[in-house]
């Protein structure tokens, strides 16, 4: 720790921390229009100049040293800031009354602060037309070229979305240069030369709302908000992102609809621009509320009677609910012996419980701040930028600010990952090799491993010159080519070899391919070979790294081999320096998993669907009985940081709530938030109204509370390590993935006016070309046997039976229930591929085609339930299907 003094105030900080950050944390105001917390300094505005130990420095870029004495103001500094403020006002439209940023404009605030009431400089203006960028609108006449939009996109989102382009303004004369302070001249010179432009002129900017949020003026704004409301008329309602498990802090900005309409309306969503980042669905997908809800007493009574009389025996729901609602469901389960059905939360619950047995802790030990502070990160089992974009932002931040390196394991390439950094490597691999990833991590980083595991891992090395050459020359399968099956990367078993040490040094820099006593020999990991890893490259990017983390996604949770993966992940947390984060797949999956006792099978009887299909449904969209959306409820979520965070109701609601049903059944609290102090043993007895929800000036998190990660007695028992085999992709078939496009998360985001769209089959340009289809074409997607996601190539087995050639069992008969999900007209039993035998019935849907140049494969989304793509993904997020073109974008058939 270092001690510095700013304007006479003693401040403690880390050696090397930026002075501006220290000042903000200590409550000392230093003006700055270009700097973003957690971003790279650009020195664009130069307003943050200070005097440090007698020298002029820019506090956004100058690092604190122990004993430093800093002054934020002096006559010279004030004169510079006054001149810079005047420069920003040159030819700046004096139309604050109608500007969307008026009332929260940082330039406006600066002009008031500096008491700028004169203008000493002038130059001929240039034509600057307003530009429509889709979801964003850019007005160059208001732009001060602070570069925040560029910084936010690059350092937070990991994309090069915006760039500087020539403005075409007049050059400044020598007389103008001599007439003003040098920093003001530098700012003016840049302002005359540059404007902002999109890198891709066809980009609709749906994923770059963050860049508009950080704009200090009204230059870059949301198109839908333009000229809609004055900022000072809006009331901010603090809440949490309802769409994904980051549950990030956001504010619903509301006011009444008009003079004759007292009902309030959400006009936009905003955020704490310095410390919270919102993805597209959180920022744009907020208007999915049930604003026309009514109380259908007949349906309400039917639900109550059905549960009381034992006719309703199941409640099927998803994890887009609050902790309080989950508690209500659990109390109803206990009282009426109901089966609670939530497949994704159950899978996550089972994974966590198995993980805890072997990790020796109640929960995983990493959070998003851990990721940001890491300098080596492994990501596996997730399409990160789609499944958990805010974690993707954290990884990108670590790469940009900490020079972090790492590995992104995924069968398909996400082009956006390449923007994180040159040493953050995408490693394609065959599906089914998830266990090999964790075994390689244990082999590479494990310390003080149990003897049984140490012996197994040591047996999975080869020592030979030939093996080393083969490993370095090996090329992974090209996931983009639909003719290449996933099995090209190798089968699930790895040949055993004896010998080698398997522990890694604490900094992870030990070379697993190091030379043995014979310099011609190298030690090669069989797991690394199966995954296609270049171990020499890995050792290079591991050099001098000290802070390690591992992100595990839904691919590891939704697989028949999830129990083995959970145990191995627990061992990684316990025996390696990697901090582990297991991503909850939906908004409140972690909360539901901790609060509810979930069932794998439905009980005999009727099913109440809560925002799901059922014999009778209670939900926000197209249900028998109206339910409130998460925008209309107060309660809490448990996010992936293991924090219980509050959310508040932004809009009124006129229908029944789940708490009303519970009260009618004798499980009663006046309000749902009455359950907040009694959510369960893992939670704190804190009332809802006592929960905070903000970040302070230093970025410290004051949102709710963090769950206690209690130590548990860890299992020392040896277990059988099952290895899955890659999914078999047959002739004429293609591997598809279950995932959403980057701006979609669920049926609620898909129902919003800004993001509303129908689901489609998303293809990379390469696959689309190979299949002979284009955007807008209609295709049939089908499986002849309806169970291709269960088909495996030979090679599945155990690590102790590396030479077993028996292979995996063939596909099981398709479950009869799945046939009910077929699209109308799917599967003619008299067709060539049809038969009366159940195993040969078709699974089939029809979808239009969209092209996603950022993804190297094919995927079907789940945000649009009408698409019914889930019929292909019963046990895994991967499936092997055939795709046949039906008609082109003009509706013309083949």
Where do the protein language model's features map onto the residues?
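Active-site phosphate/pyrophosphate-binding segments
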Residues: 422-478, 515-606, 685-686, 691-704, ...
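Phosphate/diphosphate-binding loops
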Residues: 207-267, 374-376, 380-406, 611-623, ...
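Anionic-ligand anchoring segments at beta-strand to alpha-helix junctions in alpha/beta enzyme folds, i.e.
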Residues: 316-367, 567-599
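A cross-kingdom feature strongest in bacterial/archaeal respiratory oxidoreductases
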Residues: 1, 30, 35-37, 330, ...
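Glycine-rich, acidic loop regions that bind phosphate or pyrophosphate groups
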Residues: 289-296, 342-473, 480, 515-530, ...
């Amino acid at each position: 720790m270092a001690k510095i003094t700013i304007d006479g105030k003693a401040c403690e900080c880390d050696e090397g921390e930026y002075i501006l950050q220290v000042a903000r944390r200590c409550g000392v105001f230093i003006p700055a229009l270009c700097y973003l917390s957690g971003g790279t300094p650009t020195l664009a505005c130069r307003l943050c100049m200070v005097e440090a130990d007698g020298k002029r420095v820019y506090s956004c870029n100058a690092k604190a040293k122990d004993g430093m004495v800093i002054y934020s103001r002096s006559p010279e500094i004030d004169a510079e800031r006054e001149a810079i403020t005047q420069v920003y006002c040159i030819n700046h439209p004096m139309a604050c009354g109608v500007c969307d940023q008026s009332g929260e404009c940082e330039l406006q605030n600066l002009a008031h602060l500096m008491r700028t009431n004169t203008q000493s400089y002038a130059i001929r203006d240039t034509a600057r037309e307003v530009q429509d960028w889709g979801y964003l609108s850019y007005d160059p006449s208001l732009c001060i070229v602070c570069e925040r939009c560029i910084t936010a996109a690059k350092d937070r989102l990991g994309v090069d979305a915006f760039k500087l382009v020539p403005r075409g303004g007049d050059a400044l004369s020598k007389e103008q240069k001599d007439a003003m302070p040098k920093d003001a001249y530098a700012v003016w010179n840049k302002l005359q030369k540059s404007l902002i432009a999109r890198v891709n002129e066809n980009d609709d900017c749906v994923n770059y709302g963050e860049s508009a949020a950080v704009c200090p003026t009204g230059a870059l704004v949301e198109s839908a908000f333009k000229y809609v409301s004055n900022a000072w008329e809006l009331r901010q309602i603090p809440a949490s992102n309802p769409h994904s498990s980051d549950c990030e802090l956001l504010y619903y900005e509301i006011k009444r609809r008009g003079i004759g309409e007292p009902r309030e309306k959400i006009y936009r969503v905003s955020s704490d621009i310095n410390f919270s980042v919102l993805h597209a669905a959180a920022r744009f997908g907020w208007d999915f509320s049930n604003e026309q809800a009514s109380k259908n007493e007949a349906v309400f009574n039917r639900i109550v009677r059905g549960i009381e009389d034992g006719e309703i025996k199941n409640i099927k729901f998803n994890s887009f609910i609050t902790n309080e609602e989950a508690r209500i469901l659990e109390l109803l389960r206990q009282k009426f012996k109901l089966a609670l059905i939530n497949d994704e939360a159950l899978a996550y619950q089972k994974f966590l419980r198995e993980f805890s047995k072997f990790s020796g802790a109640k929960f995983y030990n990493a959070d998003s701040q851990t990721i940001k502070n890491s300098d080596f990160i492994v990501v596996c089992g997730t399409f990160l930028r789609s499944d958990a974009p805010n974690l993707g932002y954290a990884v990108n931040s670590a790469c940009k600010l900490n020079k972090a390196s790492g590995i992104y394991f995924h069968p398909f390439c996400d082009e956006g990952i390449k923007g994180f950094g040159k040493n953050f490597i995408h490693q394609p691999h065959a599906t089914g090799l998830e266990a090999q990833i964790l075994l390689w991590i244990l082999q590479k980083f494990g310390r003080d491993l149990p003897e049984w595991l140490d012996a197994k891992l040591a047996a999975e090395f080869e020592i030979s010159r030939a093996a080393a050459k083969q490993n370095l020359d090996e090329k992974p399968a090209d996931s983009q080519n639909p003719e290449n099956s996933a099995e090209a990367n190798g089968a699930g078993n790895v040949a055993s070899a004896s010998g080698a040490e398997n522990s890694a040094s604490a900094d992870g820099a030990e070379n697993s391919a190091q030379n043995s006593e014979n310099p011609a020999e190298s030690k090669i990991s069989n797991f690394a070979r199966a995954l296609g890893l270049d171990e020499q490259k890995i050792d290079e990017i591991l050099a001098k790294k000290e802070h390690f983390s591992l992100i595990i996604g839904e691919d590891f949770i939704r697989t028949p081999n999830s129990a083995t993966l959970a145990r191995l992940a627990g061992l990684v947390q316990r025996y390696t320096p990697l901090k582990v984060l297991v991503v909850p797949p939906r908004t409140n999956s972690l909360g539901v998993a901790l609060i509810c006792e979930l069932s794998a099978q439905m009980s005999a009887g009727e099913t109440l669907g809560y925002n799901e299909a059922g014999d009778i449904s209670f939900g926000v969209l197209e249900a028998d009985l109206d339910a409130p959306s998460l925008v209309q409820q107060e309660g809490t979520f448990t996010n992936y940081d293991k924090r219980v965070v509050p959310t508040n109701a932004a809009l009124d609601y006129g229908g029944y709530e789940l708490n009303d049903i519970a009260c009618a059944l004798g499980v009663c609290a006046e309000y749902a938030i009455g359950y907040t102090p009694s959510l369960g043993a893992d939670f704190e007895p804190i009332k809802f109204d006592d929960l905070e929800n903000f970040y302070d000036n230093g970025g410290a998190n004051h949102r709710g509370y963090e769950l206690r990660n209690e130590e548990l007695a860890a299992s020392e028992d040896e277990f059988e390590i099952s290895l899955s085999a890659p999914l078999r992709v047959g002739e004429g078939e293609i591997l598809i993935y279950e995932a959403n496009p980057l701006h979609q998360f669920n049926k609620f985001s898909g129902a919003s006016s800004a993001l509303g769209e129908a689901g489609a089959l998303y293809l990379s340009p390469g696959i689309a070309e190979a299949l002979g289809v284009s955007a807008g074409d209609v295709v049939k997607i089908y499986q002849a046997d309806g169970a291709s996601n269960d088909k495996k190539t030979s090679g599945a087995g155990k690590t102790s039976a590396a030479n077993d050639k028996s292979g995996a069992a063939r596909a099981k008969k398709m479950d009869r229930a799945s046939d009910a999900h077929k699209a109308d007209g799917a599967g003619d039993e008299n067709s060539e591929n049809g038969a009366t035998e159940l195993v040969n019935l078709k699974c089939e849907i029809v979808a239009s085609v969209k092209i996603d140049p950022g993804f190297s494969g094919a995927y079907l989304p789940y945000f649009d339930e009408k698409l019914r793509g889930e019929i292909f993904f019963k046990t895994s997020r991967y499936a092997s299907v055939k795709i046949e073109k039906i008609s082109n974008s003009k509706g013309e058939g083949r």
